[in-house]
């Protein structure tokens, strides 16, 4: 009984050690996706006796699209990917060995009137086949802010959107690099024009946990399981 208990404890310890590390809990307000406030500019001194004030000017012909740190930009998500892969492997190996009948001084050796003539045949077969199909689509829109302006004029953007549900949360996170000339007159940009794009759409709380396999099932599906 003690031996069985000890074996059970060892197996539980090994399974716990082989289970994948749990993912870090995702929470809103991550500094990596937080909005960046605009840069503070020195306000010019007011000029007395003048109708025009440079502190409150508004250009009728200037570019009103996002181009500075802290400006808001709308990303239109139009992502669609599809992949298909099929592999097949087949191996076969046959071998045959024959041993002549043993003799001593020309007389065949036998045991219980049975000849010692031996033939050995070996045959090994292996076949494997795998098919994988995957498709993903993401559509919608999200407003992000410009977090940095690179020396070449490229804009670095980032932002997140959270939707609180009854049993958890859904979140969407976006980051990447944008060229100012790709921004439309309505201050929007297509997701396909974002370089080094990072899109994350998932769930947190009970909503995300229900779609995730337990640690024991993940162990049987991992490389640690020998079968």
Curated annotation (Swiss-Prot):
Keywords: Bacterial flagellum, Cell outer membrane, Lipoprotein, Membrane, Palmitate, Signal. A lipid is attached at residue 18 (N-palmitoyl cysteine). GO terms for molecular function: cytoskeletal motor activity. Transmembrane segments: none annotated. InterPro entries: Flag_Lring (IPR000527). It is a lipid-anchor. Residues 1-17 form the signal peptide. A lipid is attached at residue 18 (S-diacylglycerol cysteine). One of its GO terms (cellular component) is cell outer membrane. It is found in: Cell outer membrane; Bacterial flagellum basal body. GO terms for biological process: bacterial-type flagellum-dependent cell motility. The keyword Transmembrane does not apply. NCBIfam families: PRK00249.1-4. PANTHER family: FLAGELLAR L-RING PROTEIN (PTHR34933:SF1). Belongs to the FlgH family. This is Flagellar L-ring protein. It comes from Hahella chejuensis (strain KCTC 2396). The gene is flgH.
């Amino acid at each position: 009984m003690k031996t069985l208990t000890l074996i059970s404890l060892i197996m539980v310890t090994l399974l716990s050690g082989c289970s994948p590390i749990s993912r870090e809990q995702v929470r809103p307000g991550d500094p990596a996706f937080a909005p960046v406030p605009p840069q503070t500019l020195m306000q010019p001194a007011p000029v007395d006796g003048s109708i025009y004030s440079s502190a409150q000017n508004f250009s009728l012909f200037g570019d009103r699209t996002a181009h500075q740190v802290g400006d808001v930009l709308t990303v239109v998500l139009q992502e669609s990917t599809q992949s298909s892969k099929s592999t097949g492997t087949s191996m076969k190996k046959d071998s045959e060995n024959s041993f002549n009948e043993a003799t001593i001084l020309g007389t065949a050796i036998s045991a219980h009137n049975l000849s010692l003539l031996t033939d050995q045949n070996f045959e090994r077969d292996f076949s494997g086949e795998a098919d994988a199909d995957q498709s993903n689509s993401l559509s919608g829109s999200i407003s992000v802010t410009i977090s940095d302006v690179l020396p070449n004029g490229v804009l670095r953007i980032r932002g997140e959107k959270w939707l609180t549900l009854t049993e958890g949360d859904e979140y969407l996170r976006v980051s990447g690099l944008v060229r100012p000339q790709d921004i439309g007159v309505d201050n929007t940009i297509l997701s396909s024009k974002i370089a080094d794009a990072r899109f994350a759409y998932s769930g947190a709380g009970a909503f995300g946990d229900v779609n995730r396999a337990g640690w024991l099932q993940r162990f049987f599906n991992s490389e640690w399981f020998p079968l």
